[in-house]
Amino acid sequence: CGASTSLGMLVGWRVIQGEETWRVVDGILTNTRTGGNLMTEARFGDFKLHAEFRYPPNGNSGIYLRGRYEVQIIDAPQAEPATDLIGAVYGFLEPSAIVTNGPDAWNSYDITLVGRMVTIVLNGQTVIANQAIPGITGGALDSDEGAPGPLLLQGDHGPVEFRNIVVTPAG
């Protein structure tokens, strides 16, 4: 078992909407079970995000961009692309392909968000290319689409792990 850090020691993040179930173990941000969502204290306008993630079989999570637009993380073996599957902006934009390394393997997102235009690269393949997000995802923190907002990692659907989360300004 590696070194563990309670979330209280993780600077720049806080749990909202539920129980604190997040831990940092050997540099991996881990949600151990169904619990709260994890939100950055920082707010972002136009940005590029790199994040690596790992989910268990039947896992379900997501990354809310600016706290408003959910990029889906879900176990979807042999699925056809849909707006509720991995690579999608939940409920709005369908990926061109399901490009997953599967459960229990590391996957990566490289996401660029400028205004409401989003590009999503999943495991090295562009699955959404500079498309407009038509509205906010259910569960969004607010509806002020012109304002900067936080990143939010979904923890209310069960276990998930993240590492190498890097946000840089777009442009």
Where do the PLM segments sit?
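Carbohydrate-interacting regions of secretory-pathway proteins
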Residues: 1-171
